UniProtKB/Swiss-Prot annotation:
Pfam families: GATase_2, Glu_syn_central, Glu_synthase, GXGXG. [3Fe-4S] cluster binds at residues 1138, 1144, 1149. The keyword Magnesium does not apply. Coiled coil: none annotated. CDD domains: gltB_C (cd00982), GltS (cd00713), GltS_FMN (cd02808). Keywords: 3Fe-4S, Amino-acid biosynthesis, FAD, Flavoprotein, FMN, Glutamate biosynthesis, Glutamine amidotransferase, Iron, Iron-sulfur, Metal-binding, NADP, Oxidoreductase, Zymogen. It comes from the Bacteria. This is Glutamate synthase [NADPH] large chain. FMN binds at residues 1085-1142. NCBIfam families: PRK11750.1. Glutamine binds to the large subunit and transfers the amido group to 2-oxo-glutamate that apparently binds to the small subunit. GO terms for molecular function: 3 iron, 4 sulfur cluster binding; glutamate synthase (NADPH) activity; metal ion binding. Residues 926-936 have a biased composition (Basic and acidic residues).
Length: 1515
C-alpha cells in the first residue's frame, strides 16, 4: 500500500533525491550552505533567576522575525530558539510526579532530537544515551516527552521534525557542579560518536547540562512558545536567556542547524572557517588536558562533519571552556580584538591579545556573538565590528543585548544606559558574583589572570635581524644565462618582466589593467602555464563582506609566527616560544639571515626531480620530499625549508605550490604540522597571486629568489633609473605585501595566520584525485590534468630552457594579444569582422564573425560542448521573433565615468529602441535623460545600478527605471572596490556623483549595508519601498558555492539574479584580479540553476548571465545552462568602435569609447544603429540554432542541459576535463525550469502604507500635514514609500522643507528615512536602528530621547551603524551617539550627532558632519570631500584619525566657526539636547575644543581657506 505524501513530505523526498544525485555528480556540496540571523541575550546582573528574563527573551526573539526567512508556506522558518538556565523547580516537580524523590542538588536535563520515522533507530539511540550516562555512574530519572504543537509549523518542517524528548539525570555522585558539567560534556561526545558509529541519522543533542537547556526548531520566531508550551510555565525561570532567529541560504529544514548552539549563538559568517577547520585538525593531535584525562580521544575530532561555520566555532569554544578557560577568555582567543587597531589599546590588553594570537589562528569574519559557559554571559563583536550589537541596562538590574534596539519594550524612565559594542569589544555578566563587566574592565580582569606580558617576551621578533641584513645589500649571484634559463623553465616572458614586475619595483604597486580576460583558462591554453594559473581566488559576496585593505589596514596583519605551536589547551609560557615576522614575504638577504638564525633547528629539502626519472619521476619526488620532511620533523626540526635551487640541466623543479601542498597536507595527516614552520625558496614566484596560492596551501614564509635576480639584472641595465637596488627590492616586497592583503581582504580575512592553509581557491583543470591528495581544502568541480600531465608540461618547458644554446625570453601575450603569444578571444581579425558587419548591416558578414569565433581551438569551457537534439528541425519562421528575443538582451553596468557620455548614451538609445535594457552602471544618471528627445529617442537607462559607492543614488534616480540592480561583485575584480581617478572626474561626472571635479572618488569593496544575507534582504526591501514598480536584480560573480548564495538571494525576494563570469570587462583592475579571480559563467550559472531548482526557487526568479558572450551559440548554451536573459558588454563596445587597446584606465582611449578627455571623445564613431544591428544579428542567429534543434522558443531550452554533451577535442589534457557536473539535471517537479512569476516578488508593507493613506490631503490638495504614530523595531524603512510617492507627484525638491512631518514614538526599525526627499521630516522620540538616512535625498530626520528619559544624550547610543550611507542631501540631528561607519560615503547631507563608532566619515565626498563627542578608530579614512567638526575634550582625535587623505586643525576662520555654531544651534532646536546647549552656553571656551577635518584634495578648492599652516598631521 502506498501512502500519498503531503506537499512537505514530497518536497523533502524530492530534495533528498535531487541532492544525492547532484552530490554524486560532484555538482553540489551541502557544506556550501550559509546562514545569518538576529541574535541577542538577556541577563539578570545579580545572577538570580527570574521569570521576566525568560519572558523578555521570548519577546526579543519575536521582535527579530524579519531577520530570518520564511518558506513559501508561511509557516516553515529557517530556525529559531532560546537558551536558558535549567528550571530546577520545573524538572524536580516532574521527577516527583513520575514517582521519584527529588534530589537536593541540581538535576541535569538532556534536550534530545531522536529519529522520528524509524522506531528501531529511536530505541537504539535511547539505549546508547542511557548506556553512556550509566557508564559514568550517574542516575537516570527517566525520559520526558516534550509537549509540542505540530499544528503551527509548516509541512516541510513537520516532514523533517525529530522526536523531541528530554532525559533527566541526577548527580547522585555528589560531584561539584563543574565536574558534573565536564562529565556531561564527555558523555555527550561519547554518545555522538557511538550513534555515528551505528550509522544512525537524525539524532542530535541540543543540550545536556545541569546549568542550561536549549529549546529550538524549524519554526518562526513568534511560534516558539506555541510550539514549546513548556516555556509559558511560570516555573521556567532563568538568570539569562540567549536567543537566535536564523536565515539560511537553503530551503531544506534542518532542525539541528537552528541556533543557539551549546555555548553560543552567532550572527554573521566566519570567513576563515576553512583555514580554522584545517588548523584545528593539526592542533587536535596535540590536544591534551588533565580535565579530560583518558577521555581526550572521545572528544576528537573536535569539529565534526557537516557543521556550519557557527557550529564549528561553537565546538571549539566548548572544548576550550571545558579545559578550564572562562567564556570571555575563550572569546578573546578565538575572536580577538585587532592588535593593530588603535594606539589607545592599553599595554596589558596588547599583551593579552599577543598571547591569544600566539596560540590560535583567529576565527575572523562578521560576528555578533552571544555566549555562555553557565557562569558567564557574554556579548562579543568581531575585530571589524561588522554586525550590530546594541544593549540596554535597566534600573531593575537587567541587561538586554542584541542585533537591534527596541526588541523588548522598556519604560524609558527605567533605562540607565543604552550602548553598543564596537569592534572587538565585549560586555559580560558574571552570574556567580553578580557583576557586570564592560569591555575595558573585562579585559583588565582577563589581563590579570596570567603574566601575559612576561610570556609574550618569549617570542623572538626576527624583523630587526632580517631588515639589517637587507640594508647591508641584497645578493645577486646568478649570471644572465642561468637567469634566462630558469625564467624560461618557468614560462616567464618579457611581458611578465615589463608589465607585471616593473611597476611593482618602480612604484611599489601591482600593475593595473583594463577590459576583461579574453585568453583561454589555463587548462585550455596551448602555451605553458605555471601551476598557480590553475587556481582561482575565492572572494566574499552577500553572506559576508570583503574589507578594504587600504583604508582599513589597521585591522589587518601579515604577522607570521614560525616554530613549534604547542598544545592549544595549555596555558603557559611555552606557547609563546616562537619566532615572529611582520610579513611572510622575504627578500633573499632576509631569508638567508633567517636561515642563519635558525641554524640546526632547520632542515632543507630539495624540491627538484630528475628529468630522466621516467613517467613516475614527479610522483616519486613528492613521495621523497614528504618522507624527508617527516623524518626531519620527527628528528626535532622546528623549521623546514623547501627549495628548488638545485634545478639545472639534469633536474627540474617540482612546482613549489605542489611541493608545499603535498608536504603541508602530509604533515597534517601525520599529526606533525604544528611542530614546524614550512618555508619556501622558489624561482617560480613573481606576482601576488602566486604568493597567495603558496601561502594558501600551507607555506609559512616565501622567498622568490629568481624574481629578485631578475630585478637585479634589470637594475644593472639601468631600467629603474637612479633608484638604488635595495629600494627596488623594498618596493617589490611592499607590492607583494599589499597584494596579499588585498587578496585576503577579498575573502574578508584580516589576518594571514587564518588565511594560511585555508585553501581559499578553486582548482580549475586539475584532477580531483590530485586535489584531494595534495590540496584537500579546495574543490575541483571539473577535474582535469593529474601528476603525469603536470610532469609532462614541466619537462617540456624545462627542455626549452636547457636544451638550447642561447635562451632569449619570449615576448609573451598572456595579458595583451601578441602573434606569438596566447590566443585571445578578441583578436584583431575578429574585431574587424564584427565592426564591418554592424557598420554595413550585413548578417552575412556577421556569420563570418560567428564562424571565426566558433571554429577556433577551445578557449572557454563552452567550447568543449556540442548541441544535440533528437527533434526534427523546424522552419525559422516558426521560431519566436527577433523582437521577442532581443528583449532578453542587456548591456551590462558600465558607468558614465568608465564610458564617455557619448558611448553611454548610445547604448541606452539603442537598447530602448528594441525594448531591451541598458544598465546605468555605478555613478548616477543625468536627470536630463529621464525624458525622451523630441525625436522620441530615450537616453535613459532602463536598469539603475546600486553599487557600493552609491554615487548619484537618489530617490529620483531610483524611480526612473524598470529595474534596480544591486552590484554585489564585478566579474573582473570580485571582492574589490574601485576608484575613479581625479582626472576622470569632470564637471559633469562630479555633478552626477554629487562630488567635486578633479577629486578622486572611491567605491568601497563591500556595500556597507550588506554584511550578511539578511542585510541584503533589507536593501531589497528598501529598494522595493522607494520604487514600488521596479524589479530588483542582484549581481553576483561566478564561484564555487554560488548556488547556495543565489538561493539565499532568491529567499530575500530578489526578482533577477545575474551571474557574471570572470572574463567580463572593467575600466580598471589589478592584473592579477582580472586574470585569477572568479570562475567562468558556465560553472556558476549551471550551479545556480541546479541549486535553485533543488530548493524549488527557480520558478520565482529570472536568471541572467554575462561575461564574454559573443555569438548566438554562446546564448543558446547559456540558456541550456539555465539563463533567461543575456548581458552583452564587450561586444557592444566593439560594435561602437572599441579596438581593445586596453587603455581604459589611463583616459587615453583612441576611439572615444572609454574616455573623458574632450578631444578624444570627438573620435567616437558609434551609433545606436550599429548596436541595434549587433543585437538583431545575435537574435537571428539564436533563431536559426533553435530551428535547427527543433525548438520554437528559448523558453523550451532553458535548463535543458540534456541538449548539451562534452566532446573530445583530440587533446589529452582537454579530455581529462569532466563537465558532467555542470550538466547534471535536477527534476523541477511541478515547476517550470524558468521564471513563471508575473510581476515581482513583493515585500510586506511597512508603516508607510498607513502613512500614505493618512496623507491623502497632501497628495490631493497639497496640504501641509503632521501625522503621529507609535513605532516598533519591526517597522522598517519608515518614510521610504512616502518619499517615492512625493518624488513621483512633486519631484525630489518640489515641496518646502517640513511640508509633511511624521512624529514617531518608540524605536524605529532599520533604514529609517531611507531615500527621504525634501518636504518630509521624520521625528523620532526614542531611538533607531541601523541605516538611518540611507540615501537621504533632501529630507530631515530628528532622533531624540523621550522627555521622560533620564539618559545623558552624549553618553548613550541613539542610532545604529552605517548612518547616511550614500546620502546626497538633507539633514539629520541625533541627540546621542551613532554606531560604526557613521556618514560612510556621505555625499551631501548635513548631520549633527554626539559621538560615533569606528570608521566614521569613511569615503565621505560631500556634506558636513558635526560630532559632539568622541569618535572611534580610523576616523575619516578615504574621506575626499565634505568637512567634519569633532568636539574633543581630551585631545584624543590624533590617536583615532586616519590622516592619509585629510588634515585636521583647530578652527581658525570665522566663517567656519559660524557654520559650526549655526548647526549646533539647529541641533539644539530640533533635539532639545542639554549637552549641546551647554556647549553653546560657553561657546568662547568650548569652540577651542573642536577640530576641523578637511580632505587634502579639497584644500585648494575651498571658497574660504582654512589657514593650512595651522594644520597638523596625526604623526
Amino acid at each position: 500500500m502506498t501512502t500519498e505524501l503531503n506537499q512537505g513530505e514530497q518536497f523533502v523526498a524530492d530534495f533528498r533525491a535531487n541532492a544525492a544525485a547532484l552530490t554524486t555528480a560532484n555538482a553540489y556540496n551541502p557544506e556550501d550552505e550559509h546562514d545569518a540571523c538576529g541574535v541577542g541575550f538577556i541577563a539578570a546582573i545579580d545572577g538570580k533567576p527570574r521569570r521576566s528574563v525568560v519572558e523578555k527573551g521570548i519577546e526579543a526573539l519575536k521582535a527579530v522575525w524579519h531577520r530570518g526567512a520564511v518558506d513559501a508556506d508561511g509557516k516553515t522558518g529557517d530556525g529559531a530558539g532560546i537558551h536558558v538556565a535549567v528550571p530546577q523547580k520545573f524538572f524536580k516537580d516532574h521527577v516527583k510526579v513520575i514517582g521519584h524523590r527529588a534530589p537536593d542538588n541540581k538535576l541535569a536535563v538532556g534536550q534530545v532530537f531522536l529519529p522520528r520515522i524509524s522506531l528501531d533507530a529511536q530505541e537504539a539511540c535511547r539505549c546508547i544515551v542511557e548506556t553512556e550516562i550509566l557508564a559514568f555512574g550517574y542516575y537516570i530519572y527517566g525520559w520526558r516527552q516534550v509537549p509540542i504543537n505540530v499544528d503551527i509549523i509548516g509541512e516541510k518542517a513537520n516532514a523533517t521534525r525529530p522526536e523531541i524528548e528530554q532525559i533527566i539525570v541526577g548527580n547522585n555522585k555528589g560531584v561539584s557542579d563543574e565536574q558534573f558539567e565536564l562529565d556531561l560534556y564527555i558523555i555527550r561526545r561519547r554518545i555522538e560518536k557511538a550513534v555515528k558509529g551505528e550509522q544512525i541519522n537524525d539524532f542530535y543533542i541540543c543540550s545536556l547540562s545541569a546549568r542550561s537547556i536549549i529549546y529550538k526548531g524549524m519554526f518562526l520566531a513568534e511560534q516558539l512558545t506555541t510550539f514549546y508550551p513548556d516555556l509559558l510555565d511560570e516555573r521556567f525561570e532563568s538568570d539569562f536567556a540567549i536567543y537566535h532567529q536564523r536565515y539560511s541560504t537553503n530551503t531544506f529544514p534542518t532542525w539541528p542547524l537552528a541556533q543557539p548552539f551549546r555555548m553560543l549563538a552567532h550572527n554573521g559568517e566566519i570567513n576563515t572557517v576553512k583555514g580554522n577547520v584545517n588548523w584545528m585538525k593539526a592542533h587536535e593531535t596535540r590536544m591534551e588536558h588533565p580535565a579530560f584525562g583518558t577521555h581526550m580521544q572521545d572528544l576528537k575530532p573536535v569539529i565534526g562533519v557537516g557543521l556550519s561555520d557557527s557550529g564549528s566555532l561553537d565546538t571549539v569554544f566548548e572544548v576550550m571552556v571545558r579545559a578550564g578557560r572562562t567564556a570571555p577568555m575563550v572569546k578573546m582567543m578565538l575572536v580577538p580584538q585587532a592588535l593593530t587597531s588603535s594606539q589607545t589599546t592599553p599595554d596589558n590588553h596588547k599583551a593579552l591579545i599577543q598571547y591569544c594570537n600566539s596560540v590560535m589562528e583567529p576565527w575572523d569574519g562578521p560576528a555578533a556573538l552571544a555566549m555562555t559557559d553557565g557562569r558567564w554571559v557574554v556579548g562579543g563583536m568581531d575585530r571589524n565590528g561588522l554586525r550590530p550589537m546594541r544593549y540596554t541596562i535597566t534600573t531593575d538590574g537587567l541587561i538586554i543585548g542584541g542585533s537591534e534596539t527596541g526588541m523588548v519594550k522598556i519604560d524609558e524612565t527605567q533605562v540607565i544606559e543604552k550602548g553598543r559594542l564596537g569592534p572587538g569589544e565585549m560586555i559580560a555578566v558574571d552570574l556567580q558574583s553578580g557583576k557586570l563587566y564592560r569591555d575595558r574592565e573585562l579585559k583588565d580582569h582577563l589581563a590579570t589572570l596570567k603574566p601575559w606580558d612576561k610570556w609574550v617576551q618569549n617570542t623572538t621578533h626576527l624583523d630587526e635581524l632580517v631588515k639589517t641584513a637587507s640594508l647591508k645589500g641584497e645578493p645577486s649571484d646568478m649570471d644572465k644565462a642561468e637567469l634566462r634559463r630558469r625564467q624560461q623553465a618557468f614560462g616567464l616572458t618579457m611581458e611578465d618582466m615589463e608589465l607585471i614586475l616593473h611597476p611593482m619595483v618602480e612604484d611599489g604597486k601591482e600593475a593595473i589593467g583594463s577590459m576583461g580576460d579574453d585568453s583561454p583558462i589555463a587548462v585550455l591554453s596551448d602555451k605553458y602555464r605555471g601551476l598557480h594559473h590553475f587556481f582561482r581566488q575565492n572572494f566574499s559576496q552577500v553572506t559576508n563582506p570583503p574589507i578594504d585593505s587600504l583604508r582599513e589596514r589597521r585591522v589587518m596583519s601579515l604577522k607570521t609566527r614560525l616554530g613549534n605551536l604547542g598544545n592549544i589547551l595549555d596555558e603557559d609560557e611555552t606557547q609563546t616560544r616562537l619566532l615572529q615576522l611582520e610579513s611572510p614575504v622575504l627578500t633573499t638577504a632576509e631569508f638567508r639571515a633567517m636561515r642563519d638564525y635558525m641554524g640546526d633547528t632547520a632542515a632543507e629539502i630539495d624540491a627538484t626531480f630528475p628529468v630522466d626519472g621516467g613517467p613516475e619521476a614527479l610522483r616519486d619526488a613528492l613521495r621523497r620530499i614528504r618522507q624527508e620532511t617527516e623524518d626531519a620533523v620527527r628528528g626535532g626540526a622546528t623549521h623546514v625549508i623547501l627549495t628548488d635551487e638545485a634545478m639545472g640541466p639534469a633536474r627540474a623543479a617540482i612546482p613549489a605550490i605542489l611541493a608545499t601542498g603535498a608536504v603541508h597536507t602530509h604533515l597534517i595527516r601525520s599529526n606533525l604540522r604544528t611542530f614546524t614552520s614550512l618555508n619556501v625558496r622558489t624561482a617560480e614566484g613573481l606576482d601576488t597571486h602566486y604568493f597567495a596560492v603558496l601561502i594558501g596551501v600551507g607555506a609559512t614564509t616565501v622567498n622568490a629568489y629568481l624574481a629578485q635576480e631578475a630585478i637585479a639584472e634589470r637594475h644593472r641595465r639601468g631600467l629603474f633609473g637612479s633608484m638604488p637596488l635595495e629600494k627596488g627590492m623594498a618596493n617589490y616586497k611592499k607590492a607583494i605585501d599589499d597584494g596579499l592583503l588585498k587578496i585576503m581582504s577579498k575573502m574578508g580575512i584580516s589576518v594571514i595566520s587564518s588565511y594560511r592553509g585555508g585553501g581559499n581557491f578553486e582548482a580549475i583543470g586539475l584532477s580531483r584525485a590530485l586535489v584531494a591528495e595534495h590540496f584537500p581544502a579546495m574543490v575541483s568541480r571539473i577535474s582535469g590534468i593529474g601528476l603525469n600531465g603536470i610532469q609532462k608540461k614541466v619537462l617540456e618547458q624545462h627542455a626549452t630552457a636547457y636544451n638550447e644554446e642561447v635562451v632569449a625570453l619570449p615576448v609573451g601575450g598572456f595579458y595583451r594579444f601578441r602573434k606569438s603569444g596566447d590566443r585571445h578571444g578578441w583578436e584583431g581579425g575578429v574585431i574587424h569582422t564584427l565592426q564591418q558587419a554592424v557598420t554595413n548591416d550585413s548578417y552575412t558578414t556577421f556569420k563570418k564573425y560567428s564562424e571565426q569565433v566558433n571554429k577556433r581551438p577551445p578557449m572557454q569551457l563552452r567550447d568543449l560542448l556540442e548541441l544535440r537534439s533528437t527533434k526534427a528541425p523546424v522552419p525559422v519562421d516558426e521560431v519566436e521573433s527577433i523582437t521577442a528575443i532581443r528583449k532578453r538582451f542587456i548591456t551590462p553596468g558600465m558607468s558614465m565615468g568608465a564610458l564617455s557620455p557619448e558611448a553611454h548614451g548610445t547604448l541606452n538609445v539603442a537598447m530602448n529602441r528594441i525594448g531591451a535594457k541598458s544598465d546605468s552602471g555605478e555613478g548616477g544618471e543625468d536627470p536630463a535623460r529621464f525624458r525622451p528627445d523630441k525625436n522620441g529617442d530615450n537616453w535613459n537607462s532602463a536598469i539603475k545600478q546600486v553599487a557600493s559607492g552609491r554615487f548619484g543614488v537618489t530617490a529620483e534616480y531610483l524611480n526612473q527605471c524598470r529595474e534596480l540592480e544591486i552590484k554585489v561583485a564585478q566579474g573582473a575584480k570580485p571582492g574589490e572596490g574601485g576608484q575613479l581617478p581625479g582626472f576622470k572626474v569632470t564637471e559633469m561626472i562630479a555633478r552626477l556623483r554629487h562630488s567635486t571635479p578633479g577629486v578622486m572618488l572611491i567605491s568601497p569593496p563591500p556595500h556597507h549595508d550588506i554584511y550578511s544575507i539578511e542585510d541584503l534582504a533589507q536593501l531589497i526591501y528598501d529598494l522595493k519601498q522607494i520604487n514600488p514598480d521596479a524589479k530588483v536584480t542582484v549581481k553576483l560573480v561566478s564561484r564555487s558555492g554560488i548556488g547556495t548564495i543565489a538561493a539565499g538571494v532568491a529567499k530575500a525576494n530578489a526578482d533577477i539574479i545575474l551571474i557574471s563570469g570572470n572574463s567580463g570587462g572593467t575600466g580598471a583592475s589589478p592584473q592579477t584580479s582580472i586574470k585569477f579571480a572568479g570562475l567562468p559563467w558556465e560553472m556558476g550559472l549551471s550551479e545556480v540553476h541546479q541549486v535553485l531548482t533543488l530548493n524549488r526557487l527557480r520558478h520565482r526568479v529570472r536568471l541572467r548571465t554575462d561575461g564574454g558572450l559573443k555569438t548566438g551559440r554562446d546564448i543558446v548554451i547559456a540558456a541550456m545552462l539555465g539563463a533567461e536573459e543575456f548581458g552583452i558588454g564587450t561586444a557592444s563596445l566593439i560594435a561602437m568602435g572599441c579596438i581593445m587597446v586596453r587603455q581604459c584606465h589611463s583616459n587615453t582611449c583612441p576611439v572615444g569609447v572609454c574616455v573623458q578627455d574632450d578631444k578624444l571623445r570627438q573620435k567616437f564613431v558609434g551609433t545606436p544603429e550599429k548596436v541595434v544591428n549587433l543585437f538583431t544579428f545575435l537574435a537571428e542567429e539564436v533563431r536559426e540554432i533553435l530551428a535547427g534543434l527543433g525548438f520554437r522558443s528559448l523558453n523550451e531550452v532553458i535548463g535543458r542541459t540534456d541538449l548539451l554533451h562534452q566532446v573530445s577535442r583530440g587533446a589529452e589534457h582537454l579530455d581529462d576535463l569532466d563537465l558532467n557536473p555542470r550538466l547534471a539535471q535536477v527534476d523541477p517537479g511541478e515547476n517550470a525550469r524558468y521564471c513563471t512569476l508575473q510581476g515581482r516578488n513583493e515585500v510586506p508593507d511597512t508603516l508607510d502604507a498607513r502613512i500614505v493613506a493618512d496623507a491623502r490631503p497632501l497628495f490631493e490638495e497639497g496640504e501641509k500635514m503632521q501625522l503621529a504614530y507609535n513605532a516598533r523595531n519591526t517597522q522598517r524603512a519608515i518614510g521610504t514609500r512616502l518619499s517615492s510617492m512625493v518624488t513621483r507627484k512633486f519631484g525630489m525638491f518640489g515641496l518646502q522643507p517640513g511640508h509633511i512631518t511624521i512624529r514617531l514614538r518608540g524605536t524605529a526599525g532599520q533604514s529609517l528615512g531611507a531615500f527621504a526627499v525634501q518636504g518630509i521630516k521624520l521625528e523620532v522620540m526614542g531611538d533607531a536602528n541601523d541605516y538611518v538616512g540611507k540615501g537621504l535625498s533632501g529630507g530631515t530626520i530628528v532622533v531624540r530621547p523621550t522627555t521622560s528619559s533620564p539618559l545623558e544624550t552624549n553618553k548613550n547610543t541613539i542610532i545604529g551603524n552605517t548612518v547616511l550611507y550614500g546620502a546626497t542631501a538633507g539633514k539629520l540631528f541625533a541627540a546621542g551617539q551613532a554606531g560604526e561607519r557613521f556618514a560612510v560615503r556621505n555625499s551631501g547631507a548635513t548631520v549633527v550627532v554626539e559621538g560615533c563608532g569606528s570608521n566614521g566619515c569613511e569615503y565621505m565626498t560631500g556634506g558636513t558632519a558635526v560630532i559632539l563627542g568622541r569618535v572611534g578608530d580610523n576616523f575619516a579614512a578615504g574621506m575626499t570631500g565634505g568637512m567634519a567638526y569633532v568636539y574633543d575634550l581630551d585631545d584624543s582625535l590624533p590617536l583615532y584619525i586616519n590622516d592619509e587623505s585629510v588634515i585636521f586643525q583647530r578652527i581658525e576662520v570665522g566663517h567656519y566657526e559660524s557654520q559650526l555654531k549655526h548647526l549646533i544651534e539647529e541641533h539644539v532646536t530640533e533635539t532639545q539636547s542639554r549637552f549641546a546647549a551647554e556647549i553653546l552656553n560657553d561657546w568662547a571656551r568650548e569652540v577651542t575644543k573642536f577640530w576641523q577635518v578637511v580632505p587634502k584634495e579639497m584644500l585648494n578648492r575651498l571658497e574660504v581657506p582654512v589657514h593650512l599652516p595651522k594644520a597638523i598631521s596625526a604623526e
